[in-house]
Amino acid sequence: MQSRLSRAVGSFTCVFIVLSGVSVAVGPASRADPSDYARPPVPLPVITPTPSDWVPKFPFPFDQTKNRVTDADINAEREMCQWFNAQYDELMRQINRLQFNRITPNGPGVYMGSGSDWDYSIGDLQQQVDIVTTNIDQSVSFLAPRAQALTRSTDHAGNVYFPIYQGESFYLLWQHLSNVNAGIKSHQAAWFTGPSVHRVLRWGSRIHRSNVCE
């Protein structure tokens, strides 16, 4: 009886961890049709940057580092914003739905040997994984050279910072998105990849709330 209770508690905990990631992702769109969230993943188009009239913002204290922002910084963030506006929300919807689907093929919870979570052979789970990881690969490949092109400076205390507004957010979003992809591809448990998903959501939320891409 005690072992059954322990398994039940463990299952509830795992479901809660994954669903908590989902709630962060879809919070702003809570009034949307729930069936929209459950849509199967589809391949996302390759982003081709186009000319735009976007310019960076310099709220305090970034007005103090404006002189350190280069043309390369501006071009990199302009193009990353085009990706963010076009695909970030949909990509995170796909990731969160996949995380949810990974723990539910055999009912709520993850049981050792149940064929869920780390086993992608249930139903069309492998197909979902292939589509989502390909989309993440594509996004990471797009972000990598641009995030790496951002200027990083050091202040008087030896701390590294990005002179351009939200440069750090884009850089860390790229890093953690790469970690999410590696975790899914290596069949890591949903609870193990969950922290990286939450970090992507954190930095994506910061970018969104800053209005830097408007």
Language model features by range: what are they?
Residues 1-33:
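Secretory targeting and sorting signals
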Residues 16, 20, 88, 138, ...:
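Prokaryotic Sec-type signal peptides and long signal-anchor helices
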Residues 119, 123-170:
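Short, solvent-exposed, charged loop/turn and helix-capping segments
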Residues 33-44:
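Cleaved targeting-peptide boundary
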Residues 74-81, 111-129:
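Second-shell loop/turn segments in exported
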Residues 43-111, 154-214:
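C-terminal amphipathic alpha-helix
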